[in-house]
Amino acid sequence: MKVHLLKSKIHNAIVTSGDLEYEGSITIDCELLEKADMIPNEKVLVVNNNNGERFETYIINGVRGSRVIQLNGAAARCALPGDEIIIMTFCEIDAEESREFKPMVLIVDRNNNPKRRHRIGEEDEQLD
């Protein structure tokens, strides 16, 4: 049997901009993607901590070091610049493997600088 689990998340990211004219997606600084164990084109669930909105989209690589978290297309209507969001990816694995699987959590500051990360159930790794 397969189960769906949290694979990784970027916690408390701040939306930096939006582009309604773009076809869709969320643009994320590629350095943040690497630290959070996420990849371009991966499906994400985004939760807006300011208004409770939840939506799905996919990732586009942003410029390294830019700290960009930009919502594109219709997603730009779901959060405004300055809103705090959580960006999550999920995976499907065998139920047996799920007992050992530990999602990656990247925590960022108000400027989207990576502060620390950890696999759930393990010690934090300080990044600043």
From Swiss-Prot:
Residues reported to bind substrate: T57, G73, A74, A75
Instruction: Copy the pathway line from the protein's UniProt record.
Output: Cofactor biosynthesis; (R)-pantothenate biosynthesis; beta-alanine from L-aspartate: step 1/1
Q: Does this UniProt record's set of keywords contain Lyase?
A: yes
Q: How is it modified after translation?
A: Is synthesized initially as an inactive proenzyme, which is activated by self-cleavage at a specific serine bond to produce a beta-subunit with a hydroxyl group at its C-terminus and an alpha-subunit with a pyruvoyl group at its N-terminus.
Q: Where in the cell is it found?
A: Cytoplasm
Tell me the cofactor note: Binds 1 pyruvoyl group covalently per subunit.
GO MF annotations in UniProt? aspartate 1-decarboxylase activity
Q: Name one GO cellular component term.
A: cytosol
**EC number(s) in its UniProt entry?**
4.1.1.11
- Gene3D superfamilies, A to Z: 2.40.40.20
* The UniProt record lists the keyword Nucleotide-binding: no
Q: Which cofactor does it need?
A: pyruvate
Question: What is its biological role?
Answer: Catalyzes the pyruvoyl-dependent decarboxylation of aspartate to produce beta-alanine.
Q: Report the sequence similarity comment from the record.
A: Belongs to the PanD family.
Q: What is this protein called?
A: Aspartate 1-decarboxylase
